[in-house]
Amino acid sequence: MKKPIIEFKNVSKVFEDNNTVVLKDINFELEEGKFYTLLGSSGSGKSTILNIIAGLLDATDGDIFLDGVRINDIPTNKRDVHTVFQSYALFPHMNVFENVAFPLRLRKVDKKEIQERVTEVLKMVQLEGFERRSIRKLSGGQRQRVAIARAIINQPRVVLLDEPLSALDLKLRTDMQYELRELQQRLGITFVFVTHDQEEALAMSDWIFVMNDGEIVQSGTPVDIYDEPINHFVATFIGESNILPGKMIEDYLVEFNGKRFEAVDGGMRPNESVEVVIRPEDLRITLPEEGKLQVKVDTQLFRGVHYEIIAYDELGNEWMIHSTRKAIVGEEIGLHFEPEDIHIMRLNETEEEFDARIEEYVEVEEQEAGLINAIEEERDEENNL
């Protein structure tokens, strides 16, 4: 990894008035020029991290670094970051141009440069021609663009975004996701985005930190987070999941629902109790006799791009299926899935334990592969004599 632009070392936060612990020993590094998302439900601590970076809150313990410099005692206005708030925090008595130009005027930039830079950023956020428009006459999406333009006008090292899309309607929110991501990539500025919306995080991020109860429970790329959740919380918080109790018989073989299935996971103890995760979109409806499992359809909803089907197996386990094929309530169907569709989670495994287990397992696999290759080469040499 390159030199981090932001680093948290053992950062904790306790609100002393009610002794509430909101952050617990947070450690992470953010690389320059990437789009990071802090994802979690209300009260998870994600906005607290953002406010500590901005200097709006002090950490109780730990160190915060910006570009290698400890900034715990540096005031907000001296930090090379800018925050876009959920409320946008625009000045209603100023027009669009004046709002965007405000940070430059605070720094006493000359009028010609202000004109050039404001014109440039308004073009970036697709607000050309809105310079003299009153803030009160703008739509929610337009106000959002003004707030972003003001955030980037000083070319900060980091832009912090605290749930800026939450007040927008679905269509506009989706459009702004594309615009934010494209803008970040064009500028090359580090974006730190806070949201409770899983789809936003998956769509825009280079890297996601999933938070719960003041802790980072998992971090990774959107694909890693979605395909390889490390625990029950992440599996249920990120998308829909079918989660069942199971037993890892041995590497690549798991038992659940009273049957054994091939899998792609390994590195666990023989007969270890685990949780089995299969995503609804990975289940394919078949004839009952052709399925690996048989279930009875209970309810069905049309979601536009697919049907969401709820079914139950003979053991009473609930199954959610996303299918373009319409089912009939009350009918018995088969469910087919591939070994790679089965994800295995150890009970109560932390991210550190997960990473260590995978690293150790890969090393053992490589050693075994090397030994097999050596034996085969030795046999080939003997056969050639």
Swiss-Prot record:
Task: Tell me yes or no: is Translocase among this UniProt entry's keywords.
Answer: yes
Q: Which GO terms describe its molecular function?
A: ABC-type polyamine transporter activity; ATP binding; ATP hydrolysis activity
Q: Which reaction equation describes what this protein catalyses?
A: ATP + H2O + polyamine-[polyamine-binding protein]Side 1 = ADP + phosphate + polyamineSide 2 + [polyamine-binding protein]Side 1
Which class of enzymes does this protein belong to?
A: translocase
> Where would you say this protein principally sits, based on its record?
membrane
- Show the Pfam families listed in the entry: ABC_tran, TOBE_2
- Positions contributing to ATP binding: G40, S41, S42, G43, S44, G45, K46, S47
Q: Which GO terms describe its cellular component?
A: ATP-binding cassette (ABC) transporter complex
Q: Which superkingdom is the protein from? A: Bacteria
Q: In what residue span(s) does the ABC transporter domain sit?
A: 6-238
Matches recorded under InterPro entries: AAA+_ATPase, ABC_SmlMolc_Importer, ABC_transporter-like_ATP-bd, ABC_transporter-like_CS, Mo/tungstate-bd_C_term_dom, P-loop_NTPase, Transp-assoc_OB_typ2
Query: Where does the UniProt annotation locate this protein?
Result: Cell membrane
Keyword tags? ATP-binding, Cell membrane, Membrane, Nucleotide-binding, Translocase, Transport
Could you say which EC number(s) this protein's record lists? 7.6.2.11
Membrane topology of the entry: Peripheral membrane protein
Question: Is the keyword Cell cycle in the record?
Answer: no
Q: Could you tell me what this protein does? A: Part of the ABC transporter complex PotABCD involved in spermidine/putrescine import. Responsible for energy coupling to the transport system.
State the family it belongs to. Answer: Belongs to the ABC transporter superfamily. Spermidine/putrescine importer (TC 3.A.1.11.1) family.
Fill in the subunit field for this protein: The complex is composed of two ATP-binding proteins (PotA), two transmembrane proteins (PotB and PotC) and a solute-binding protein (PotD).
Please identify the protein, giving its name as recorded: Spermidine/putrescine import ATP-binding protein PotA
Q: Which organism does this record belong to?
A: Streptococcus sanguinis (strain SK36)
Which gene produces this protein?
potA
